[in-house]
C-alpha cells in the first residue's frame, strides 16, 4: 500500500494559477490605514476588525482578509487552526489557487520557518479527503489549485523555504497516518500493515524485518500471540531501522507502537456504542512507521528504530479468557483478568524485544492505551509517563516546538501495588482508579534496565471530533508525527 503524494503544489512567490484568491493575514493592532478607509463600514460596525478568526472577502478584487487578533497574543496554533478550512475550500474549488500574504509583523513575532511549516501542514490535512471508500470520492475528484506564499519581509525568504520543504515532507506522513487509521478493519488488516511498512521502507532505504506467527512463537512472544487467538488475522511484529548517512550522534532512539487493527475487547467485550471507533486502536503503530519515514526523508542525523506489534482482538472459542495466564517474551507470567486491556500485552513483548536486541539509549511507546487518559486530559494532550527526566524534558521541548501537546503524569511505585496477582508475576489490570498510571507501571516491567523510556498515551489525541490548534477534527489526527520529528532533532542537538 503506497503512501499518497501531496495533494497541493505549494511554492514561494507569485501564484502560478490562472485564477486565485489572495489571502491577506492581518493583525488587529497593525490594521492597514488604507483598509480602514476602504472598509470603513465593516470596521466601524465590527464586521471585520482583525479579531482572531474573522474573515472578510472582497469578491471584486478576489482578496480574502483573515484576522489573527493582537500581536502580543498570537501563537502558532492560533494561526494554523484557520488553514484547515482553506484546505477544505481548495478541495471544493475547481483549480482555484491561494496566494498567502504573510505580513512582516507576523514573521517577526513567529519565525517564518514555523509559520510556513504549520500552515502547509494544515492546508494539506484540510484538503485530504478521508471518504476514500465513497462512490462520490471516486467520481468527483477535482483539480486542486496551487498555493503560494508572499513574504512582506524578503529577509525571511530562506527561513520560509526551510519551513516549506519540511512541511511538504511531514504533512505527507501525517496524512499517511490519517489515511490508514480511518480505513475500517476489513480494509486494513495486520497484513496491510506489513504492506504499508514495506512501502515506507522501500521509499526511504530502511531495513525492514517482519515476524509472522511462526517467528513470534519461536521467540516465545506470549503477549502478542495471546491477543490474536480469537481472530483469523494473524499477529505480526514489524521492525524498521533507519541509519543516517551522516550521523550527528551515537544516541539511538526506538519508537514502539501499538497496532490493534480492531479491538472488540475480546471476551471482555466492549459496549456496542461507538465500537466502530476501535479501528483507531492502531494509531500508535501507524504513527511509529510514518514518523520514521518522515525522519528518514528529512535526513535527520539520529539512528532510529520503529517497532510495532500488530494484531486483532476478537471473541472466539479459541480467544484468551479472563483468568488465563501467559508467559511474556521476557519470561514474566501475566494473568489476564480483562481481555480488553490487550494493548499492553502486545507492547510488553515489543518493548522487551527491542530493549534486549537493540539496546537503544532512548525508547518510547505510543498507544491508544486507556480511556482513563481522556478523563484526565480530554483531547488536548497526550499523557506522558517516564522513568527519565532527560527524556521527559526532551519530549516537553519537542511538544512546544511541534505544538503537539503532552502532559507529564506520575509513575510512582504505589501505582503498581494493585497489579499484583495471586497466581502469576503480574496481572494486566489494577482497577479504575489511576488506570493510565497503572497501565504505564505494567509496561515498565518490560523495559530493560538502563534504558530511558517514556510511555505516551494518545487515546485522547489520536482522533477527535473538533479541530483544536494544529490538530484537525472529524476523525484521526496523525498526532505524534510532528512531535517525534522534533524529538529526533532535539536528541541530535543534545550534547
Curated annotation (Swiss-Prot):
Residues that coordinate or bind Mn(2+) 2: 258, 263, 281, 342
Cofactor note: Binds 2 manganese ions per subunit.
GO CC field: cytoplasm
Gene name, Swiss-Prot/TrEMBL: pepA
Sequence similarity: Belongs to the peptidase M17 family.
Keyword Hydrolase: yes
Biological process annotations from GO: proteolysis
Name of the protein described by the UniProt record: Probable cytosol aminopeptidase
Family matches, as Pfam families: Peptidase_M17 (PF00883)
Enzyme class name: hydrolase
EC numbers for this chain: 3.4.11.1, 3.4.11.10
Lineage: Bacteria, Pseudomonadati, Spirochaetota, Spirochaetia, Leptospirales
Catalytic site: 270, 344
GO MF, one annotated term: peptidase activity
Amino acid at each position: 500500500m503506497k503512501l499518497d503524494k501531496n495533494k497541493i503544489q505549494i511554492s514561494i512567490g507569485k501564484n502560478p494559477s490562472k485564477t486565485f484568491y489572495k489571502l491577506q493575514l492581518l493583525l488587529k493592532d497593525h490594521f492597514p490605514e488604507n483598509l480602514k478607509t476602504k472598509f470603513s463600514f465593516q470596521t466601524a460596525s465590527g464586521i471585520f476588525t482583525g479579531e482572531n478568526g474573522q474573515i472578510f472577502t472582497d469578491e471584486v478584487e478576489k482578496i480574502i482578509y483573515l484576522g489573527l487578533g493582537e500581536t502580543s497574543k498570537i501563537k502558532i496554533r492560533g494561526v494554523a487552526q484557520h488553514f484547515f478550512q482553506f484546505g477544505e475550500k481548495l478541495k471544493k474549488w475547481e483549480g482555484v489557487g491561494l496566494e498567502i500574504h504573510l505580513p512582516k509583523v507576523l514573521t517577526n513575532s513567529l519565525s517564518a520557518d514555523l509559520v510556513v511549516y504549520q500552515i502547509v501542514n494544515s492546508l494539506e490535512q484540510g484538503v485530504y479527503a478521508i471518504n476514500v471508500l465513497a462512490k462520490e470520492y471516486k467520481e468527483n475528484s477535482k483539480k486542486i489549485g496551487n498555493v503560494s506564499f508572499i513574504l512582506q519581509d524578503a529577509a525571511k525568504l530562506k527561513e520560509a523555504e526551510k519551513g516549506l520543504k519540511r512541511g511538504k515532507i511531514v504533512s505527507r506522513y501525517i496524512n499517511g497516518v490519517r489515511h490508514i487509521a480511518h480505513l475500517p478493519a476489513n480494509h486494513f488488516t495486520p497484513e496491510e500493515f506489513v504492506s504499508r511498512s514495506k512501502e515506507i521502507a522501500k521509499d526511504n532505504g530502511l531495513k525492514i524485518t517482519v515476524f509472522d506467527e511462526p517467528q513470534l512463537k519461536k521467540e516465545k512472544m506470549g503477549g502478542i500471540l495471546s491477543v490474536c487467538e480469537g481472530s483469523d488475522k494473524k499477529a505480526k511484529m514489524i521492525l524498521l531501522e533507519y541509519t543516517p548517512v551522516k550521523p550527528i550522534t551515537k544516541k539511538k532512539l526506538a519508537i514502539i507502537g501499538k497496532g490493534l487493527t480492531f479491538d472488540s475487547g475480546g471476551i471482555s467485550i466492549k459496549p456496542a456504542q461507538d465500537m466502530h471507533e476501535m479501528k483507531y486502536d492502531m494509531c500508535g503503530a501507524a504513527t511509529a512507521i510514518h514518523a520514521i519515514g518522515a525522519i528518514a526523508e528529512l535526513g535527520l542525523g539520529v539512528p532510529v528504530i520503529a517497532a510495532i506489534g500488530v494484531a486483532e482482538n476478537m471473541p472466539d472459542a479459541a480467544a484468551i479468557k479472563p483468568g488465563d495466564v501467559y508467559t511474556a517474551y521476557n519470561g514474566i507470567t501475566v494473568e489476564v483478568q480483562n481481555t480488553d486491556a490487550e494493548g499492553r500485552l502486545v507492547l510488553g513483548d515489543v518493548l522487551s524485544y527491542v530493549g534486549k536486541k537493540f539496546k537503544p539509549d532512548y525508547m518510547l511507546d505510543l498507544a491508544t492505551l486507556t480511556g482513563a487518559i481522556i478523563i484526565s486530559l480530554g483531547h488536548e494532550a497526550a499523557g506522558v509517563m517516564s522513568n527519565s527526566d532527560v527524556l521527559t524534558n526532551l519530549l516537553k521541548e519537542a511538544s512546544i516546538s511541534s505544538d503537539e501537546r503532552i502532559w507529564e503524569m506520575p509513575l510512582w511505585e504505589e501505582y503498581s501495588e494493585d497489579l499484583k496477582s495471586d497466581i502469576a508475576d503480574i496481572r494486566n489490570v489494577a482497577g479504575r482508579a489511576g488506570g493510565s498510571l497503572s497501565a504505564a507501571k505494567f509496561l515498565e516491567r518490560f523495559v530493560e534496565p538502563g534504558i530511558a523510556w517514556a510511555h505516551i498515551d494518545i487515546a485522547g489525541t489520536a482522533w477527535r471530533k473538533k479541530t483544536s490548534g494544529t490538530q484537525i477534527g472529524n476523525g484521526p489526527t496523525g498526532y505524534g508525527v510532528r512531535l517525534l520529528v522534533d524529538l529526533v532533532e532535539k536528541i541530535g542537538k543534545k550534547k
